Amino acid sequence: MVRSMRSRVAARAVAWALAVMPLAGAAGLTMAASPAAVAADTYAATRYPVILVHGLAGTDKFANVVDYWYGIQSDLQSHGAKVYVANLSGFQSDDGPNGRGEQLLAYVKQVLAATGATKVNLIGHSQGGLTSRYVAAVAPQLVASVTTIGTPHRGSEFADFVQDVLKTDPTGLSSTVIAAFVNVFGTLVSSSHNTDQDALAALRTLTTAQTATYNRNFPSAGLGAPGSCQTGAATETVGGSQHLLYSWGGTAIQPTSTVLGVTGATDTSTGTLDVANVTDPSTLALLATGAVMINRASGQNDGLVSRCSSLFGQVISTSYHWNHLDEINQLLGVRGANAEDPVAVIRTHVNRLKLQGV
């Protein structure tokens, strides 16, 4: 009975995960950007440009229609910030010659050439935080700060789960077929129709085992000791360049009681009869994926990334009532009644960077 219950939970989670994947978090390295809003003030006018870095399954603008960072770039611009949005492969590893890290590095250099600035402030969501860390490690002189939002620095238990499910096929055909469809999807939603997509490499990148390897290859003072569920230093100096390090994440998905070996989960971002449960399909989907993570000992999470995994540098908060997409104001600005305003949180943080002189 317990095994049957777990199987049903797993099957539903995979289905819901596939439904939400298009919205989660290619190397279109053009400098095209949305028209800058007229600045009402200089609240977010940092010394160095801000680059927003998307995560898994992302792009700068889905199918050239919907912003990944929904409403965030225009808000920052209206407060005086110079903001650029990277457009990387939606499905790819972070390291390697074709990786997202090298794509982002090329984009950083373009932004610097276009603006005359000497450094940038990187703000990455989900996998975008790992990508940002790559650039800070290999080209430290180009980076002033790294901020990660809901980033799986220690990997994602849900990525482990998906990988384990795929391994149950002895032929390996399911992995190949699913990856082919996901790669095509990545090309279609990319604003530049980027064909550099590798879904299986992206999945491996986000597993707990592979992120441990990544952290050894690209260490950062912002990381705490492995297994400690602690953050690291608020600053680091790499090659003579100092980086300010920040993070935050959502923990809307919380464990409840355990029955027959299966622990339940609740979404603290939503209230009773919350409209987000109806108008935003990712709300229930991320509750399901978060439940899978809880049953793999993740603890509280945002549906894809646990609290412990998100810790990096100076932790602004891990108490936001957000799921993984709420962190970037998705889906289309809809969020639960208890969820904080992510646009305001990011605006306040960019002001924090301004006050720090970067």
From Swiss-Prot:
Which domain of life does the protein's organism represent? Bacteria
Q: Give the range the annotation lists for the signal sequence.
A: 1-39
**Essential cofactor(s):** Ca(2+)
List GO molecular-function terms, semicolon-separated: metal ion binding; triacylglycerol lipase activity
Keyword Calcium listed: yes
Q: Which SUPFAM superfamilies match?
A: alpha/beta-Hydrolases
Instruction: List the Pfam families.
Output: Abhydrolase_1
The Enzyme Commission number assigned here is 3.1.1.3
Cellular component per GO?
A: extracellular region
Please provide the record's keywords in A-Z order.
Answer: Calcium, Disulfide bond, Hydrolase, Lipid degradation, Lipid metabolism, Metal-binding, Secreted, Signal
UniProt-listed InterPro entries: AB_hydrolase_1 (IPR000073), AB_hydrolase_fold (IPR029058)
Major place of residence: secreted
> Catalyses which reaction?
a triacylglycerol + H2O = a diacylglycerol + a fatty acid + H(+)
Q: Which residues bind substrate?
A: L56, Q127
Residue positions binding Ca(2+): D280, D326, Q330, V334
For this chain's UniProt record, which GO biological process terms are given? lipid catabolic process
Task: State what the entry records as the consequence of deleting this gene.
Answer: Loss of extracellular active lipase. Not required for growth on oleic acid as a carbon source.
Broad enzyme group: hydrolase
Report the function annotation for this chain. Answer: Catalyzes the hydrolysis of triacylglycerol.
Q: What is the protein's given name? A: Triacylglycerol lipase
Q: Which organism is it from?
A: Burkholderia plantarii
